[in-house]
A protein has these predicted regions:
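Residue(s) in the substrate-gating loop at a strand-loop-helix junction
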Residues: 32
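Active-site helix of classical SDR
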Residues: 12, 48
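Active-site loop immediately N-terminal to the catalytic Tyr-X3-Lys motif
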Residues: 39-43
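SDR active-site lid
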Residues: 62-125
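Catalytic Tyr-X3-Lys helix of short-chain dehydrogenase/reductase
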Residues: 16, 51, 56-64, 69
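Conserved catalytic-site region of short-chain dehydrogenase/reductase
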Residues: 35-37
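A transmembrane-helix-recognition feature enriched in membrane-embedded lipid enzymes
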Residues: 118-149
Length: 149
């Protein structure tokens, strides 16, 4: 929670006075698809990403009158050291290797979202499908994430 939520929340509040003075000011928070739909065995991580999504929505409302855009980026698995260090499960490491997005690609999409002021960006087709499924058929989404994580 300290890294995924508390730090971005405090940094956002600290940046506010500078953002108010800026031309076309914007703030981008990096969430996760797991901030839209929780999955088994990643409870704390999911909770922190739900929190950053909620913070982003609240700041967007609070800062709208100041002309500050508040953006939220939701990547799926990114090829980083997170899985290597945090998860010992061989299946998880294999899953990462097959489906992880390159950090450079995440950065490119983030930059495009910034330039075009896209407020909520889901990065992958699989992530979009999971969010969509959770909205229209939450029981099926629950079954799917329980089955395949």
């Amino acid at each position: 929670m300290k890294v995924n939520f508390i730090a971005p929340a405090e940094l956002s509040r600290m940046a506010y006075p500078l953002l108010v003075k800026g031309e076309q000011p914007a703030l981008m928070n990096i969430g996760s698809i797991l901030g839209h739909r929780a999955v088994p065995w990643k409870s704390e991580y999911c909770a922190s990403k739900f929190a950053i999504r909620g913070l982003t929505a609240a700041l967007r409302s609070e800062w709208k009158s100041e002309g500050i855009d508040v953006l939220h980026l939701s990547p799926s698995t990114t090829d980083s050291q997170f899985f290597d260090q945090a998860i010992e499960d061989t299946m998880q490491r294999n899953w990462k290797g097959k489906r992880a997005m390159a950090p450079k690609r995440v950065a490119e999409i983030a930059l495009d979202a910034w330039v075009n002021r896209r407020r909520d960006v889901l990065l992958t087709p699989g992530g979009k499908a999971l969010v969509w499924l959770d909205r229209i058929a939450p029981r099926i989404a629950s079954w799917a994430v329980t089955r395949w994580g």
